[in-house]
Amino acid sequence: MADYSTVPPPSSGSAGGGGGGGVNDAFKDALQRARQIAAKIGGDAGTSLNSNDYGYGGQKRPLEDGDQPDAKKVPPQNDSFGAQLPPMHQQQRSVMTEEYKVPDGMVGFIIGRGGEQISRIQQESGCKIQIAPDSGGLPERSCMLTGTPESVQSAKRLLDQIVEKGRPAPGFHHGDGPGNAVQEIMIPASKAGLVIGKGGETIKQLQERAGVKMVMIQDGPQNTGADKPLRITGDPYKVQQAKEMVLELIRDQGGFREVRNEYGSRIGGNEGIDVPIPRFAVGIVIGRNGEMIKKIQNDAGVRIQFKPDDGTTPDRIAQITGPPDRCQHAAEIITDLLRSVQAGNPGGPGPGGRGRGRGQGNWNMGPPGGLQEFNFIVPTGKTGLIIGKGGETIKSISQQSGARIELQRNPPPNADPNMKLFTIRGTPQQIDYARQLIEEKIGGPVNPLGPPVPHGPHGVPGPHGPPGPPGPGTPMGPYNPAPYNPGPPGPAPHGPPAPYAPQGWGNAYPHWQQQAPPDPAKAGTDPNSAAWAAYYAHYYQQQAQPPPAAPAGAPTTTQTNGQGDQQNPAPAGQVDYTKAWEEYYKKMGQAVPAPAGAPPGGQPDYSAAWAEYYRQQAAYYAQTSPQGMPQHPPAPQGQ
């Protein structure tokens, strides 16, 4: 048996024999823990540790403690080795670096816009991520993950989630081009118009921002109420970005949580603001040849565009694009312009004028300035471009400009059959705006027939009545630059137009020459002078001369005109003066000698047509006001 007399006890301060056994058990426990830690680090678990190597001097564990269980082996009070092992192990674990592969096409999605995505991953996992600058032509790219094992595993998990989220979904396939992919997402039917936008503006902006191609697929133009697939084609990462942008657009617009300015538009970025413009005032904002809107754009440093619409709303939306402060300045300029027009209107605005951001109000004001009329001609082949299918184009132009546009079905005499006459009625601004829209449709300028003519005191159209004397001239201005002295046109199949200052068709183009007014000195050279003389004699005498007594036995037979068309008989109880009027015209025609050498039948004879017209007028005025129109022809002059 070994001699242990020279070995000092483990602890001199222990009382009794039980204290030494407890210390030995604690030492055994510490030794066992050290072996376990060494095994984790990579050492041999069976290697025994020499206590002398760790500063225990000549202390030796008593042999009697060898058979004690490990649970009683605790480290001694002066054991510094056991306290240092956990920090050493933690320090070794914090410098772990691992290479991780990610798909090359998903790198941009992992990094995110402005590096937001990768910054979030590093912050949540506590792991540093470094991505190789390129893949070297391989389908995967290397990422170096540095951190503790737990942080590295967390970073891997987050990266896998992002890659899985960006993987092709059902309906996603690679396109024909290299690196292109196609994905289809379903858009609710109620949001399809929101994604497309007015005139396709929204979907174009999405394509430009994401760098992809988007196509909304639908079976036909009719709205079936079913969801529509949106096909996105492009780089896989860009396709995913475009998908997120579309979903964000639908989500934002559906919630109506945008911050809006005083004009009701969203604020932020360079999106600009939308300003509602009364439809009749659109021409005022645009100005003649676009001068006003160009001036506003130059002064404010913005871009102004009118959004297309269906013409059902009373206002049109002017979209102002640019910096927020400049957009606000341009909106104020437009508002001031409209206010000045409103204040200058003779009728004045109605109650509740439009306030800036304080309700919509109501203009209740007519178009500024007097109504004018503008005639122009276009080649027959381009008439369809102005009218459109079912009249949609001309209706749209009329709604956008606020002017009334008509195609004259009955052109003036001697008109060129290859040209068509159009008439625009409205304010100068409306006429100018409508003219611009028409010129855009036909791809060139129109051929005007004189400046716009205002409706003066005699300017209210009537039911195909005879023309009156020309109304007073209009003051010269930007929309009426030249003096204008029109003459009455020749008689038309349905009678002359109403008594207003008519435009002359012969002052601009020779192929629309009009008939000159009758001149007494040249009466012998005009075959229609008899009709004009009768007309003027009747016109100037209808108010001054009282109607004479109706002669007895006046004929009431049915007459026919020179073209063989049967005329309607006079109403029952009314006196028919058709024969008397015909005799009057015949006498007037015989009083004026025909020019020498004039070919017979060179000009049509409208005597019968005029007689029928005056007979109808006599019947009409006799029913409404017996004193309103003379019931007999004037006495032939010079007879």
UniProtKB/Swiss-Prot annotation:
It is found in: Nucleus. Residues 95-159, 180-246, 270-334, 371-438 form the KH domain. This is Far upstream element-binding protein 1. Residues 14-23, 345-360 have a biased composition (Gly residues). Residues 551-568 have a biased composition (Low complexity). The modification N-acetylalanine is found at A2. The modification Phosphothreonine is found at T148, T427. Found in a complex with PUF60 and far upstream element (FUSE) DNA segment. Interacts with PUF60 and JTV1. Residues 463-500 have a biased composition (Pro residues). Residues 61-73 have a biased composition (Basic and acidic residues). Ubiquitinated. This targets the protein for proteasome-mediated degradation. One of its GO terms (molecular function) is RNA polymerase II cis-regulatory region sequence-specific DNA binding. SMART domains: KH. The modification Omega-N-methylarginine is found at R316, R354, R356, R358. Residues 1-27, 40-88, 341-360, 442-527, 543-574 are annotated as: Disordered. PANTHER family: KH DOMAIN CONTAINING RNA BINDING PROTEIN. It comes from the Eukaryota.
